[in-house]
Amino acid sequence: MAAFPFEIEATDGKARTGVLKTPRGDIRTPAFMPVGTAATVKAMTVDQVKDTGADIILGNTYHLMLRPSAERVKRLGGLHKFMRWDKPILTDSGGFQVMSLSGISKLTEEAVTFSSHVDGSKHVLTPERSIEIQADLLGSDIVMQLDECVAWPAEEARARKGMELSARWAKRSKDAFGTRDTQVLFGIQQGSTFENLRRESSERLREIGFDGYAIGGLAVGEGHQAMCEVLDYAPGFLPEDRPRYLMGVGKPIDLVEAVARGVDMFDCVLPTRSGRHGQAWTWDGPINLKNAKYAEDETPLDPDSDCPASRDYSKAYLRHLFKAEEILGQVLLSWHNIAFFQALTAAMRAAIAEGRFEQFRRDFAARHLGG
């Protein structure tokens, strides 16, 4: 039995709703995890994040190992204490950021060697070191294996090479992690847009055995349609009785369509990144508050929301804050967007539990995409 029980409470088609039970609290699924890159969800306090309904946040191994350093976080009591968040934390392995942000000098069977984007210093990240940073130094609740996220588009031979390396690193990650009572390890399915590779990746991961399974290598430029085509089959290759986590996704419509295909967990920087640039996500789609048409719009973003940022401030005021380059604008829109993503996952959980998810899916798409 896995350290964190996962109870699926209802299904509707392929969509599932349930609870992942952890020592630091329950994670209701489908779940959206706000991204706390450098030990903070940008522009938000932990109390604001909690008030939106978030059960879990994501921490970033790459950023934290470089600044302030994982060893320092450990000396300061671990990531939960350091950032004053007492609910579950999932940490990524650092692999994606190494591939996308840093100057990679070498990728070998043993490790990835890279230069810090902060100060140019050289670092070596192995599967074992990633586990040490996440589990032993940061002290996260859900730990991710180190993998290679192959850039898109990829030829099948290149995608296979990355998938096979990730599978070997999965075994090394599991060996380093061992068995723990208060932490779990997720494996990561790879294979780009090739069904045969994703099937093989999943078989190798299942053979090793993980507490949960992620779908990696999507939301890297392939677009919504191509992502959905992969998700038509990829979740089905993974165990039904464990959580399935789609990494780095995404837009609200991506979440709804992925849940329809059997995904349980998501993370993305989109809500806070959009919020810092004046974009609000709403049931009626995204709106750009810098647009002149909101200059005298006295309506709030969402009068029915429990979130003060959504309910209590006019679009005209929010637009003014961005035009005046006031920091409060970024705070309020980040807050609103995280609250909206949490409201969306809560609405999906209710729709699945009540057996009306397909109707919810159709209605959401019609309203959010404007028909």
UniProtKB/Swiss-Prot annotation:
Name the UniProt key words of this record, in alphabetical order. Answer: Glycosyltransferase, Queuosine biosynthesis, Transferase, tRNA processing
Where does this protein act, in terms of pathway?
A: tRNA modification; tRNA-queuosine biosynthesis
Q: Name one Pfam family in it.
A: TGT
Class of the enzyme per the UniProt entry, highest EC level: transferase
What residue spans carry the region label RNA binding? 248-254, 272-276
A Gene Ontology biological process annotation?
queuosine biosynthetic process
Per its database record, what is this protein's job?
Catalyzes the base-exchange of a guanine (G) residue with the queuine precursor 7-aminomethyl-7-deazaguanine (PreQ1) at position 34 (anticodon wobble position) in tRNAs with GU(N) anticodons (tRNA-Asp, -Asn, -His and -Tyr). Catalysis occurs through a double-displacement mechanism. The nucleophile active site attacks the C1' of nucleotide 34 to detach the guanine base from the RNA, forming a covalent enzyme-RNA intermediate. The proton acceptor active site deprotonates the incoming PreQ1, allowing a nucleophilic attack on the C1' of the ribose to form the product.
Task: Report what the protein is called.
Answer: Queuine tRNA-ribosyltransferase
The record lists the lineage as: Bacteria, Pseudomonadati, Pseudomonadota, Alphaproteobacteria, Caulobacterales
Q: Which gene encodes it?
A: tgt
